[in-house]
């Protein structure tokens, strides 16, 4: 199975606060949003946005956005149904944000694409760095990976697909 290795860095933090993770390559941006929300410990929302600055492209759940949310110099497109490989194979990074909430934005570097026939198709946090006073991420990496395995493993993925996509 193929995966993308992503380094997700919270914007505006010094020293940087980040998580390196693997996400399955055979998914669309709507499912990737759900995975990133879980990795970043956000509540599930439909108001996510992927911004590819170099392409002047923003991917969203267009049904959940207001008219003002799609104005400006960017092209806006539907995240659901658009495969992540289409952009993650060619771009170096993107910004992930949840709109309408006071939550941090994340620069997401696309580090590499890997193949691992042994690994199940679930997202996984590989490494993280956070500051001592950071109270935004409450779960440690091992606990978070256990939650991700339960939610996105073979038994949990049907529930996710039924609810989110």
Where would I find each of the regions flagged by the language model?
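Short linear regulatory motifs enriched in tryptophan with gly/pro/ser
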Residues: 1-165
């Amino acid at each position: 199975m193929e995966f993308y290795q992503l380094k997700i860095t919270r914007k505006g933090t010094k020293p940087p606060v980040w998580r390196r993770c693997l996400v399955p390559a055979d998914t669309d941006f709507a499912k990737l949003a759900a995975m990133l929300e879980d990795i970043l410990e956000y509540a599930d929302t439909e108001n996510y946005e992927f911004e590819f600055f170099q392409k002047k492209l923003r991917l969203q759940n267009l049904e959940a956005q207001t008219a003002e949310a799609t104005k400006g110099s960017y092209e806006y497109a539907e995240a659901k149904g658009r495969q992540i490989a289409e952009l993650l194979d060619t771009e170096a990074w993107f910004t992930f944000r949840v709109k309408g909430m006071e939550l941090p934005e994340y620069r997401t570097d696309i580090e590499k694409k890997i193949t691992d026939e042994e690994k199940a198709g679930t997202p996984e946090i590989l490494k993280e760095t956070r500051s001592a006073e950071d109270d935004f991420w409450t779960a440690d990496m091992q606990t978070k990976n256990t939650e991700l395995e339960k939610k996105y493993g073979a038994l949990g993925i049907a529930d996710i697909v039924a609810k989110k996509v």
